[in-house]
């Protein structure tokens, strides 16, 4: 009877407890043959030692065993069980990517409805922090207001700018009918899923949620934002950014702006612009530090202390220049370059209306908000990976591997996390199912075929197949393209085109015949090669032509060769041949006519007559 790895380890531990020690040879004999990782073996030996069973290179003497303190006690069985469980976990390791993914996914606990709301609030808080920070960056608000002006000029759609507005005073769970269906039994869910699966490939992509923001409310909100923005700029211009009134105004515009639910494209654009400004600042500051520390040999500690004391002026540099310190002479040599960098920083401050310290503070708070939202989104995604797998299982054997289906489903899950609105009352899984299923079905339509077909054409093919099946049931026969065109209200030529596209490619390795000893590719003509019959006929014609030309004079033969391109790359005109022989065109025509008359003689033409049918 063959022992399992677990039973082998149990025997090993029992033997060790009985004799009080083990040798490395005994440990190796009881380990699985496929365990060759030195780290794993060392971990097992360490666990055996921790249980009070010493492991030796060779069997010790009886005296040495007596001197060794017996550390095993009543808890030895429990320790052995714990160690064995750890060892079994080690033995259960696999290199199969699906199993590894499942094991890692299983370590994350599922979320309750309350847990989802907590994480959704953290995501919202992170986004709020970013938007409130960006609101203090004057070009950002001006950019959004400019986008709204373009909407009013009918250059862009309102739905390209915002998706709606957030009411911070709304309840966490809106008392709406969206709860209906979230408590279905598992069997009812399975039935619904099976129905949806049959429709997924046939339906066009639908929009989730409301169709778009309310134009009247949007106009009112943007007008309010414009007024607050202009008032804030006026206060800052009159009293300075550090004035208490300016602080209140900045807080007010931040609170107002974070209620705007910006479209991801707009949100990313604002963050990117702020990042670009911060990058410009960093470039100049790094250049100043490089000049001072590396070229002028100013101690880095002194530079950091002086520069950070007042980042909006160059007074620190003038102070260091006036000092009698050893590096003052070096600073004097780089003074033009440092002042040039400071001038560029002044331009950035003028363009943004912000001091360098304020730009850094906004960027810092924005980064904190992004990190908070990113961590919360990661938690939400990891807690719902099981949902992706349960949906992906229903789409196997459709042209994509299971891991690919999981990956595509995970992309849909991440989209669902980005768009999830917990205030509507949906449980996240109810909302995410649509996005996961949509991502998977789209990927199957886009990637499953050997020859890629656009998604919109896949939808047309699915619709055509569905109607074709219906007509087959109604008429008892396959419908004609004309009948399909009439039923689908489409031109007949388009129906024929769709039918042609819908054909599945067949492998050239498909077995043919009862014995399956030949393949489909063996019966396909290779048009790139010349047929043996044509090759033999051409060679015979070439030999016959050379034979009859040999019966002419050298001049006549050459004229015919040039005129008809025999053994040459191309044929020649009378004028070209005349230049070759230094005679007139008429003379060449006469020579050609005479040579052809000779070839028409039965003694010569008989050789070529058999090639006329070829």
Swiss-Prot record:
Stretches the record annotates as Disordered: 178-222
Name of a matching Pfam family: Sigma70_r2
Short motif Interaction with polymerase core subunit RpoC, span: 404-407
Primary localization class, coarse: cytoplasm
Annotated Acidic residues bias: 199-208
Biased composition (Basic and acidic residues): 186-198, 209-222
A biological process term (GO) from this entry: DNA-templated transcription initiation
Source species, domain of life: Bacteria
SUPFAM superfamilies associated with the record: Sigma2 domain of RNA polymerase sigma factors, Sigma3 and sigma4 domains of RNA polymerase sigma factors
Region (Sigma-70 factor domain-3): 459-535
UniProt region (Sigma-70 factor domain-4), positions on chain: 548-601
Cellular component aspect of the GO annotation: cytoplasm
Compartments where found: Cytoplasm
Gene3D superfamilies: RNA Polymerase Primary Sigma Factor, Sigma-70 factor, region 1.1, Winged helix-like DNA-binding domain superfamily/Winged helix DNA-binding domain
DNA-binding residues (ranges): 574-593
GO terms assigned for molecular function: DNA binding; sigma factor activity
Subunit comment: Interacts transiently with the RNA polymerase catalytic core.
Family the entry assigns: Belongs to the sigma-70 factor family. RpoD/SigA subfamily.
Protein purpose: Sigma factors are initiation factors that promote the attachment of RNA polymerase to specific initiation sites and are then released. This sigma factor is the primary sigma factor during exponential growth.
Name of the featured protein: RNA polymerase sigma factor RpoD
Organism: Shewanella violacea (strain JCM 10179 / CIP 106290 / LMG 19151 / DSS12)
